[in-house]
Amino acid sequence: MLAVRRSKKLWSIGVLALVLGYSLYFSWLTVGVHRGLGSSAYDFGLYDQGIWLLSRWQSPFVTLMGRNLFGDHSSFILLFIVPIYWVTTSTSVLFVVQSFALGFGALPLYAYSRKALNSDAMGFIFAAVYLLHPAVGLTNVENFHPDSFLGLLIGVVLWSALERKWNWYWISVVLALLVKEDVALIVIPIGLWVALRRDLRRGVWTVVVSLGTMALMFLVVMRSFTGVAFRNSWRIPFGGFAGLFRVAFRQPLELWKYLTSDDRPTYLFQLLSPTALAFIAAPSVALTSAAVIGANLISTFWYQHQIGYHYSLVIVPSLMFGTVYGIARVPITYRKRMVGAVAVCSLAFGYWLSPLPLARSTVGDWSASNPSVVAAKELFAVIPDDAVVSAYHPLTAQLARRERIYSFPNPFQRSLYGPDVFARGDRLLFAEEVEYVMLPTVLDEAANLVWSQESPRFRVVGSNAWWIVYKRL
């Protein structure tokens, strides 16, 4: 008995070491990219500015995108990060938070799999399988997104539903719904599963709460900030919902051609293959991800059906828990083989796609000691902390903690600014209020055309071989 307890403890320590190692490695990796000017306004600087404004008790109107932070996405989960901004001035803190949130997503899967498979060793394997999944590591290096909390929170939702830990269930459901307005697409199917397999009343309430929260976020919160409830209707093919349903029923072959076009089959292959499709043995838990997978495949937005972007992370917990759930329902004599197959597939796809040590995929060279990076940071001192600034987009991620900062060519020429992301080209009314501009010494043709019209109103106050800082006359 003592030996068994010692073995269980060692496997748990191993999982904690695995999670800590992952979190520290990706913290180091992503902070290094940020310090090497590898981050940008989209999608890091805008969150850094918004949370910083909240930490100063100001309205989080993010000038890097021209929208309120909660009008862009209803990510009220970010309010829990605000206190960190009271105690640190590091612009890298969000990358550390994200890495630990993603790393901790392995813990609920370990807690469930060690019990469901009656093996701490298999629990350890599945904790590693989660961290090896390409959608986890690639989300970790894709700037910063509140979606990174969903690996942990949806994992806790599934663990608590499967184990009937109802207090944990409701806490994690509420927190998950605070991450983003469309999280209901995963929580509603989980609620339906709970209603059918665990507790009818709790499952129905999950669906009702999820639908109500989604309606509140779209129709009240986001509409009040941006004037529109749903800014991304352009992502629905065939002209919108009506056209999509019409094609689905009248021209199903056209819909099939669309769903098998571009990289969509490859995306599905990369998403599902790390599980060795073991969830097919009992697919009900894995199927809770079907709505999100379908939405990603249907979307006209290229990024949604690419494994390298954050849209896929929310799917991973359902696939992982579904895989364990499926394996737990086959005869014991086959379990080791199935777990072995999952481990091999995860290692293969982790090596192929995930930005892990010794893996095939890398994030490029973003060194803080690069002369151009050092030169940029030297010139930051020329710009006052309270100045209104327009800067080249990688620089905005370093300068975001101020009330007003714009990603050049904004506000001199609109680009990805305001509720309508397609509005572009006009000079915004407050362009004359910009006090400082920081640009590279060599501009592309479009940027040079914009700046040639504005530069007579500015003088050079700092420069080097790579960068120039201008101040309004």
Model-predicted regions and their roles:
Residues M1-W28, R114, D120, D199-R202, ...:
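Start-transfer (signal-anchor) and selected internal transmembrane alpha helices
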Residues L46-L69, F76-I77:
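Extracytosolic helix-loop segments that constitute the early lumenal/periplasmic catalytic or substrate-binding loops
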Residues F100, F104-L132, G151-L152, W168:
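Transmembrane-helix signature of polytopic, membrane-embedded enzymes
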